[in-house]
């Protein structure tokens, strides 16, 4: 391996993009830069009440360019020449419509302010009805069950549901779209000038988990399936939309002359294939087979890799897909997750902050002090809970505030808070939130184990994992497993850099690169036996409430969700 080689990892999150420079020799994180998306920060093109969340492509382009240029300018000139590759991860499923040149439609003047011409963010749930239609058709018997390898339930968060929703809602976008592309596949194509649909290299991760693609039926389902879903879907889009997909260790191309000039990097820089953030995060964390990796942020994405022989063609039910090569080439990558984790705590903080906002409006001179109080709310609640962590009067909270991803995706579900009394105070209710997120984590673990997919180890990574030991300890107690906290906040970007190093030829395989570059374990939390026993009782109560509450959100004629 060439000494001094550097790989860059690009991590496109919900709020910002991060670029991380990594030493390929030892995995040292040399420098990082984070830039927030300006339009997203202003709340443009989104409507939370309608579950509509869109990203303008300029947010990605401008933030990415600013982040990379800022980081590269801090490098000595000689070091810039040592950058050998760029890897990309992103949220998903986050697709956008593109024209025949591969330009996202919102980059054209006539679509510049049209949310339907933008990237439909992973947590956009406007396509619930369309997801229901896909599931009904998969189970109709008219076709093979194309949901077999994605856990048996197609989600409103995924590729075809979102495309169908926009197709039905917006005739102009429907007629202008030559194809659709996931963000993680579009960025490497953009940087290598290969965005045209016939040039575009689709990633095994995005295609395998979100598009119903599988080798058992030769790729995508047939055109007849989508025509039966809605003839509008195949009226203008070419068919098949694509045929091949590629693992992320393979190069997409090299940096185009235009982007090399804009970023201050050589045209020899290799672009590796893209993948979803949590899949690359698992690689950055050094995950081995049968390690459940929980990437914890606003939501969670849980990743587990398994041997082909153990899976042996079985369909694992209730998860978000099993894809050969979606994480590590040659292994089956399995995805699960919780639709809300950090978002639940943020919601509770906003709820409690209403009087502060009202006071700041009436007394502007107090705004700095009130903002400081608001910023410290969650930490204060956590401290109060840790001082008196009583489980005897813990409220029931169901962690469905943004629907449920796993087990068995159902985005119609809503959060539930129950079992309150006049003695329930804010820290106790916050304790209920902590327990709920831990219970959701255990339900995912059990979903694997009940289908003979063992969970030998549990890793947690992300800001909450490192900064909220009380929440992580609750997870260890509820799951009754040691919980290893990964030593980096940047594992997703690190994983992207690992793939860049492999694609650039510095390693022959992802496992070899992991041995050199993956991060280590910061600490291990052990379950407390006394709390394990009490949480077991509370988990059973949680499951009873889940079983009782879920039927209340079943679709009915004329119902609103």
UniProtKB/Swiss-Prot annotation:
Domain of life where this protein originates: Bacteria
GO biological process, one term: L-arabinose catabolic process to xylulose 5-phosphate
Pathway: Carbohydrate degradation; L-arabinose degradation via L-ribulose; D-xylulose 5-phosphate from L-arabinose (bacterial route): step 2/3
Catalytic activity: D-ribulose + ATP = D-ribulose 5-phosphate + ADP + H(+); L-ribulose + ATP = L-ribulose 5-phosphate + ADP + H(+)
InterPro entries assigned: ATPase_NBD, Carb_kinase_FGGY, FGGY_C, Ribulokinase
GO cellular component: cytoplasm
Gene Ontology terms for molecular function: ATP binding; D-ribulokinase activity; ribulokinase activity
Stored Pfam families: FGGY_C (PF02782)
EC category name: transferase
Keywords from the named record: Arabinose catabolism, ATP-binding, Carbohydrate metabolism, Kinase, Nucleotide-binding, Transferase
Entry EC number(s): 2.7.1.16
Family label: Belongs to the ribulokinase family.
Record-linked PANTHER family: FGGY CARBOHYDRATE KINASE DOMAIN-CONTAINING PROTEIN (PTHR43435:SF4), RIBULOKINASE (PTHR43435)
NCBIfam families: L-ribulokinase, PRK04123.1
Protein name: Ribulokinase
Natural source organism: Serratia proteamaculans (strain 568)
Gene from which this protein is expressed: araB
């Amino acid at each position: 391996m060439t000494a001094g080689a550097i790989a860059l990892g690009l991590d496109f999150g919900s709020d910002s993009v991060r670029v991380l420079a990594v030493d390929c020799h030892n995995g040292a994180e040399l420098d990082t830069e984070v830039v927030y998306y300006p339009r997203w920060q202003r709340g443009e093109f989104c409507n939370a009440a309608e579950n509509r969340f869109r990203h303008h492509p300029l947010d990605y382009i401008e933030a990415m360019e600013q982040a990379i240029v800022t980081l590269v300018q801090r490098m000595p000139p000689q070091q810039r020449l040592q950058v050998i590759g760029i890897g990309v991860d992103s949220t998903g499923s986050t697709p956008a419509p593109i024209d025949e040149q591969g330009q996202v439609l919102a980059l054209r003047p006539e679509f510049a302010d049209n949310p339907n011409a933008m990237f439909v963010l992973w947590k956009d749930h406007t396509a619930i009805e369309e997801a229901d239609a896909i599931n009904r058709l998969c189970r109709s018997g008219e076709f093979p069950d194309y949901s077999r390898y994605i856990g048996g339930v197609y989600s409103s968060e995924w590729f075809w549901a979102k495309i169908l929703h926009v197709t039905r809602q917006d005739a102009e976008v429907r007629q202008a779209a030559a194809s659709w592309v996931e963000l993680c596949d579009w960025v490497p194509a953009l940087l290598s000038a290969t965005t045209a649909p016939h040039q575009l290299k689709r990633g095994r991760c995005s295609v395998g988990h979100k598009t119903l693609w599988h080798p058992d039926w030769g790729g995508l389902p047939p055109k007849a399936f989508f025509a039966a879903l809605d003839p509008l879907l195949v009226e203008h889009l070419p068919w098949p939309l694509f045929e091949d997909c590629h693992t992320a260790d393979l190069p997409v191309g090299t940096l185009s002359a235009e982007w090399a000039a804009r970023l201050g990097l050589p045209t020899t820089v290799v672009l590796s294939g893209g993948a979803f953030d949590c899949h690359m995060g698992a690689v950055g964390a050094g995950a081995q087979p049968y390690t459940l990796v929980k990437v914890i942020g606003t939501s969670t994405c849980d990743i587990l890799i398994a041997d082909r022989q153990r899976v042996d063609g079985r369909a694992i039910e209730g998860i978000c897909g099993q894809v050969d090569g979606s994480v590590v080439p040659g292994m089956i990558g399995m995805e699960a997750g919780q639709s809300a984790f950090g978002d639940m705590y943020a919601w509770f903080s906003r709820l409690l902050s209403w009087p502060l906002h009202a006071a700041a409006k009436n007394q502007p001179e107090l705004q700095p002090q009130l903002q400081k109080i608001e910023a410290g709310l969650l930490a204060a609640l956590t401290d109060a809970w840790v001082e008196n962590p009583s489980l005897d009067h813990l409220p029931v909270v169901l962690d469905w505030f943004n629907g449920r991803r796993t087990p068995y995706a159902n985005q119609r579900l809503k959060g539930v808070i129950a079992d309150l009394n006049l003695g329930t105070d804010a820290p106790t209710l916050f304790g209920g939130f902590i327990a709920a997120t831990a219970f959701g984590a255990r339900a995912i673990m059990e979903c694997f184990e009940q289908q003979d997919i063992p969970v030998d180890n549990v890793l947690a990574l992300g800001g909450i994992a490192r900064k909220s030991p009380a929440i992580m300890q609750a997870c260890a107690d509820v799951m009754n497993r040691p919980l290893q906290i990964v030593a980096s906040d940047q594992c997703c970007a690190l994983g992207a850099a690992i793939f860049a190093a492999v694609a650039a030829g510095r390693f022959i395989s992802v496992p070899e690169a992991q041995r050199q570059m993956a991060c280590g374990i910061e600490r291990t939390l052990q379950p407390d036996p006394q709390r394990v026993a009490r949480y077991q009782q509370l988990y059973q109560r949680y499951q009873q409430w889940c079983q009782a509450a879920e039927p209340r959100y079943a679709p009915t004629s004329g119902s609103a969700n």
